[in-house]
Amino acid sequence: MKTKEINELTTAEMLDKEKSYKDELFNLRFQLATGQLENTARLKQVRKNIARLKTALRQQELNK
């Protein structure tokens, strides 16, 4: 997810996306532990997306 796409989302949508990414990260960690994860780069992508969302949320909070 690109920063431009994130900035176009509303606060509620950002929070929903963050929750879904956290759930996905949780599942990916279990797959990694059990040896079922094929695309290990997805872990990094999801973590980066969560960080981008948190940054955008904080920026919105400071701009208010």
Curated annotation (Swiss-Prot):
Gene Ontology cellular-component annotations: cytosolic large ribosomal subunit
Any one GO BP annotation for this protein: translation
NCBIfam families the UniProt entry points to: L29 (TIGR00012)
GO terms of molecular function: structural constituent of ribosome
Family of this protein: Belongs to the universal ribosomal protein uL29 family.
Organism, scientific name: Levilactobacillus brevis (strain ATCC 367 / BCRC 12310 / CIP 105137 / JCM 1170 / LMG 11437 / NCIMB 947 / NCTC 947) (Lactobacillus brevis)
Protein name: Large ribosomal subunit protein uL29
Keyword Ribonucleoprotein found: yes
Claim: Ribonucleoprotein is one of the keywords in the record: yes
Cysteines paired by S-S bonds: none
Keywords noted in UniProt: Ribonucleoprotein, Ribosomal protein
